[in-house]
């Protein structure tokens, strides 16, 4: 049995602990740590319910701790096989450094590019595996895109698209908070890594808007930061790019969302990271935009995740196109409703932990998501979250449905 520490018991952190215990089939003992007792209390309710839903025994500890305190974090890390960091991106580098120092394998779901580069620097002196960006996007999307790209000799255009959306949109933004509002605003403000004309570069977020439809539903997609992960450099190393290749990641939303967010973040200047106070003492910056979203945009469990990869390139001398699409709705599992964004993000990082335990990922060093083949990912029970979420409960012998 492997001892795994999950730092952060927010909405998705709780789900990571629960899913690892549910689908790990007794392979893991989980310690879930957070400084908010309310989060731990909710986690206990979920895990006590899980005990009644699965046939195998589950072992866990819930620890109230200040995860911003380096000494407390090091104490929690002692004797652990792995740590999954579910904290805001500003905590990531410190946790990764401590984990590497103590010989604890490191995983996170961060989308922040600068933070990931700091993890890569730590990995230059790696004692363990350091595996950042393990969620949905970045994360699974790179695995899926690599699976499409490997079918081509050279790539003309590869577009990765992911959206976590409300099933029922009723406000002008056509958006509900289903993920970290701070993470969303960060993605909408930071530069976006792309390849244009065969050259790796950056473009501003909220640009490159395109419109498309699936199954009668209209969507838009636009550049956002972080989702492409390390895929561009991997495809360059694989010699699949040409002097005209275009590769990019875009976030999917309902039409009209991008324009309104540009109004808030750019025209109203709420995208500033460190704004100076006005004469009245008010500060108009990203923190205010995050607060506005959390105040006004209701949360929902009735969400849907859309994954769409399209690739045009050359195969055996012919120009072809291959598409990949998955649509995941919120699902009843283990006695409760799992929002799609929680399930897919948790499944992404849990799968990578499981594959490392099984020796199917590098034992040490910086590990890219696309180093995991899609077929290998889907061989874990966590792959069902993307392929057939309704079958997850049956796969682990669950008896429970949401009450």
Feature-to-residue mapping (PLM):
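Helix N-cap at the beta1-alpha1 junction of Rossmann-like dinucleotide-binding domains, i.e.
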Residues: 35-39, 113
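Conserved Rossmann-fold cofactor-binding substructure of NAD(P)-dependent oxidoreductases
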Residues: 65-79
